[in-house]
């Protein structure tokens, strides 16, 4: 990914509509940089009032090392800005971000519009669901602020969503309770996915690389 960003379908979608689309696979970013980048299961950066992702899904394993708020990682999109909209869509899988300060979440990493610095131009989420285990992030949006343009969002009660923090010079792993939306159990999640959209994802071959960082949530207490 590096300084360019990456998405399962597109690195950047500007004033574009993506409907009834899906991605299944692994995305790995091992590049170390302080520059901004955006990584998403479907789209790295979704920008513009006419930019829409609708009736879509991503089944992902994302391994990343985002380490600042302008480095974004999301199960559907990394950065959603300038009134762009994700609706009737969901992500499932795992996101393992090995550093602590990125904007990381199961649906969208970052919604705030940096150019206008106004919440009325932030990205929008409607009828979205996160069924994603997340390390060092949140379930729905990775950056929380007042007045977020999010309606009808859902997450899986059984997902492990954690952040690693420092408390009194001790590294502590704590559950992330921000941006959970309406929390559903496993049976409700399955029903809600079908209600949101009924896309089927084609089978793909496993991508094997020497730089893969595996998500191992069994070690989280």
Language model feature labels by segment:
Residues 1-221:
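Predominantly extracellular beta-rich ligand-binding scaffolds that present long acidic/polar faces
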């Amino acid at each position: 990914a590096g300084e360019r960003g990456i998405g399962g379908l597109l690195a950047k979608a500007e004033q574009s509509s993506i409907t009834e689309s899906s991605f299944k696979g692994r995305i790995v970013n091992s590049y170390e940089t302080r520059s901004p980048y955006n990584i998403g299961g479907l789209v790295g950066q979704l920008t513009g009032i006419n930019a829409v992702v609708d009736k879509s899904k991503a089944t992902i394993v994302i391994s990343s090392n985002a380490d600042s708020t302008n480095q974004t990682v999301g199960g559907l999109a990394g950065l959603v800005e300038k009134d762009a909209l994700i609706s009737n869509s969901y992500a499932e899988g795992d996101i393992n971000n090995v550093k602590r300060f990125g904007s990381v979440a199961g649906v969208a990493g970052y919604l705030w519009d940096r150019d206008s610095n106004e919440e009325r131009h932030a990205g929008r989420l409607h009828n979205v669901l996160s069924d994603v285990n997340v390390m060092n992030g949140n379930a729905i949006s990775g950056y929380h602020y007042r007045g977020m343009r999010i309606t009808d969002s859902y997450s899986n009660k059984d997902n492990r969503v954690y952040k690693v923090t420092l408390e009194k010079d001790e590294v502590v792993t704590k559950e992330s309770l921000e941006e959970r939306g309406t929390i559903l159990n496993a049976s409700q999640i399955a029903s809600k996915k079908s209600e949101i959209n009924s896309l089927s994802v084609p089978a793909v071959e496993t991508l094997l690389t020497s730089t893969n960082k595996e998500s191992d949530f069994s070690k989280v207490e």
